[in-house]
Curated annotation (Swiss-Prot):
Proline-directed serine/threonine-protein kinase involved in a signal transduction pathway that is activated by changes in the osmolarity of the extracellular environment. Controls osmotic regulation of transcription of target genes. The TXY motif contains the threonine and tyrosine residues whose phosphorylation activates the MAP kinases. GO terms for molecular function: ATP binding; MAP kinase activity; protein serine kinase activity. A motif (TXY) lies at residues 126-128. Belongs to the protein kinase superfamily. Ser/Thr protein kinase family. MAP kinase subfamily. HOG1 sub-subfamily. InterPro entries: Kinase-like_dom_sf (IPR011009), MAP_kinase (IPR050117), MAP_kinase_CS (IPR003527), Prot_kinase_dom (IPR000719), Ser/Thr_kinase_AS (IPR008271). This is Mitogen-activated protein kinase HOG1.
Length: 200
């Protein structure tokens, strides 16, 4: 088993909400490509411990150790998308999909983990989401109106990183991130830009 320690989860309202949300989601999400929660306990110091299955490494460590062969890339991407399909069908947006939140065992079985930033789908979302390299443009432009597509964008960024061996959009900040995206993908046509509404 693996044990995830959350120190002082009740020290702030934000941390308490995040811990509760992750616990609630892990309790209900049951899929072979999503980490499963087997137990939970609280220490006398009020630290919380999530007990999950043990997988040997994460995708980030694999990517930094050696290039991946194409058949592994295909199998990993298949499992990521399969796990996301299940998570999304449950009405959940992960919001922080990145290689270090994807666990892998010695049989190349893959599981999505770390649901601390995940949310039930809602017309009004919050802006604090996803590690910058894997952040969808709509979060940068209209951070309150996004949906499961942001996880698909992140999965695409992870796919490109598996192929290239490095992050596709390694932005230093929001502006640089968006600049790198438009340099690679081009500027959207005016009719697309005109459909983007921002309340920021």
């Amino acid at each position: 088993v693996a044990v995830k320690k959350i120190m002082k989860p009740f020290s702030t309202p934000v941390l308490a909400k995040r811990t509760y949300r992750e616990l609630k989601l892990l309790k209900h999400l049951k899929h072979e490509n999503v980490i499963s929660l087997s137990d939970i306990f609280i220490s006398p110091l009020e630290d919380i411990y999530f007990v999950t299955e043990l997988l040997g490494t994460d995708l980030h460590r694999l990517l930094t150790s050696r290039p991946l062969e194409k058949q592994f890339i295909q199998y990993f991407l298949y499992q990521i998308m399969r796990g996301l399909k299940y998570v999304h069908s449950a009405g959940v947006v992960h919001r922080d999909l990145k290689p270090s939140n994807i666990l892998v065992n010695e049989n190349c079985d893959l599981k999505i983990c770390d649901f601390g930033l995940a949310r039930i789908q809602d017309p009004q979302m919050t802006g604090y989401v996803s590690t910058r390299y894997y952040r969808a443009p709509e979060i940068m432009l209209t951070w309150q109106k996004y949906d499961v597509e942001v996880d698909i964008w992140s999965a695409g960024c992870i796919f490109a990183e598996m192929l290239e061996g490095k992050p596709l959009f390694p932005g230093k900040d929001h502006v640089n991130q968006f600049s790198i995206i438009t340099e690679l993908l081009g500027t959207p046509p005016d009719d697309v830009i005109n459909t983007i509404a921002s309340e920021n």
